[in-house]
Amino acid sequence: MMNESLTEKRNELSLSFAALGVVFGDIGTSPLYAFGQVIKYFPINDHNIYGILSLIFWSLIIIVSIKYLVIVFRADNDGEGGIIALAGVIRQKIKQPGGWLLFITLVGIGLIIGDGMLTPAISILSAVEGLESLSPNLAKYVLPVTLIILFFLFKMQSIGTGKIGVYFAPVMLVWFITIGILGFLQIIQNPKVLMAINPYYAINFFMIHKYLALFILGGVFLVMTGGEALFADLGHFGKKAIRTGWFAVALPALLLCYFGQGALVLMHTEDIKYPFFSLSPDWFLPVMIILATLATIIASQAIISAAFSILKQASLLNLIPRLKIVFTSKFEKGEVYLPLINFILALGTCSLVVIFKSSSNLADAYGIAVNLDMLITTVLVGIIAYRCWSWHAFKILIFLLILIIELAFFAGNIPKLLTGGWIPILIAFLGFVVMYTWHCGFEKLRELHHRDALMDAFIIDELNQNKISRQPGMGLYIIDPYDCEGESLLHHLRLNRIFFENMVFVSIKIENKPYIPIEDKFELIKKAEGFYLIFIHYGFTENINLPNELDEMFKRVYLPFDVIKNKLIYFIEIVFVEMTGERQKHMYLWQKHFFSLMIRNAVPDIQFYQLPYNNTIAIGTYYQF
């Protein structure tokens, strides 16, 4: 019993250590730019610095430690976190939640795409800016070096991070220890800054500066960027490991670093351009720049991988067009590479660096995207707390208090819309337009298939009455998600009068859960004599490999005929959309053309389901929009 307990603790510590290299990269590198961004708004004096440090301290405690690690962690979807997981929880409890949930989910995914561009840009740029602290003459190399690092960062995505990923956690542990020590060395020279832990200084700051204090909130919010990753990566590491890593390593190191920067600027009230790098002694500065660059590369890798993961899930749920998915590891099923998304993120990130030129300028664009993402999480978890947990009024009031605090941060970020904050909003809007257009087109296809279902119902009767001649063999028909029970393929059979002796229609169902246990994965329905419909249920985080699933299915699902696996013929549908000039419900003409373009360029079923090329027949179907 004792050995089992020791083993469990070791596993937990091992997971906590691994989480340092993935979960805390983004929030862990915020000290590079966050404090310097905050102090530029007001004169440096005791009251202002104490007020700022108090706001930083209580923001990390209330929003990250309490909201995320205590409340939001309760809203996991079978151990999985993130916006799609939250939406899945709501769909499980509220059968028809309405269009509002789709809207919030699509906006959230759009913001994540923007985050995937902004995080690498501001993180790596802020690290390379340390060259200016080394020598002002090196300032001209900041942009070229940043762009070179970003080029290789996105270039390496296609080969995966399996071999070098083992070094992420050790590097981040060294990073946290280093920034904690550097901050502590400044605090012991000016320990009075620890008084800022008292919330009085945060309240007093607002009483002195009144509405002007809202401007500071936009900067203070930067210390929490990356906080949403704690929940998004829940499925990889678990609650205990993330909580241990946060409270034992990340949070203490961050607080020491921020308070150390506060102590430093109070002792040196002259203009300090980069307070973070000023913490380091001159002899250690080159090492610090290298370490900061490595840490920001790791943080950027984490957000890129998260973007790949969330968009893969969105693709499975048909929220976006099907994407080419490359699995970069034989051992880690979650390691995926999306070539198109990688290109978009790389282009967007490098463009942001060239346009804004400094981390200080980029900070205005960065905070508002993460702020909106956190607000969406708060709203969704609030709905779950009310509808699923049956929280009473007092607990709901606590959650409303958190929402009010986050809305105050959002108010502080609104002035940044004019200085770059509009960029993540634009990215999210463009992403929303793509996803909503795809959704509308998909629903139109469902409507057309429902109409065909009424036309083809007579086929079932004829099959049951043996009025249709059949040829020997077996046909395996893969049904698209918009085709509930294979109406389009039945329509093809009706026109061509080609009926196999045994026909199996396979429908893929993506559920609102991350994983589906093997015993619940398959569902068999006999539609007619020799005609079967099989549903294969997947979770939204699972990888689809249809031939492998069919092997497992034939072992578990009884069929009254023999299946010769190497002679299986797969039938799939290729959709062609023909436009009409009419505006239809929820779709403008430009949306119909855009949907037609997307469906033509989406990854075909044969690749998406990983079907064998030599044993697959594609059937083209035209639909008039």
UniProtKB/Swiss-Prot annotation:
- Where's it found, cell-wise? Cell inner membrane
**Its function?**
Transport of potassium into the cell. Likely operates as a K(+):H(+) symporter.
Recorded protein name is Probable potassium transport system protein Kup 2
> What does the UniProt keyword field contain?
Cell inner membrane, Cell membrane, Ion transport, Membrane, Potassium, Potassium transport, Symport, Transmembrane, Transmembrane helix, Transport
Q: Which family does it belong to?
A: Belongs to the HAK/KUP transporter (TC 2.A.72) family.
Q: Which cysteines are joined by disulfide bonds?
A: none
Keyword Amino-acid biosynthesis in annotation = no
**What is one term from the GO cellular component aspect held by the record?**
plasma membrane
**Listed GO MF terms:** potassium ion transmembrane transporter activity; symporter activity
InterPro entries, sorted? K+_transporter, K_trans_C, K_trans_N, Kup
Question: Could you list the residue ranges that cross the membrane?
Answer: 15-35, 52-72, 98-118, 134-154, 164-184, 212-232, 246-266, 284-304, 336-356, 365-385, 394-414, 417-437
Query: Native species of this protein?
Result: Legionella pneumophila (strain Corby)
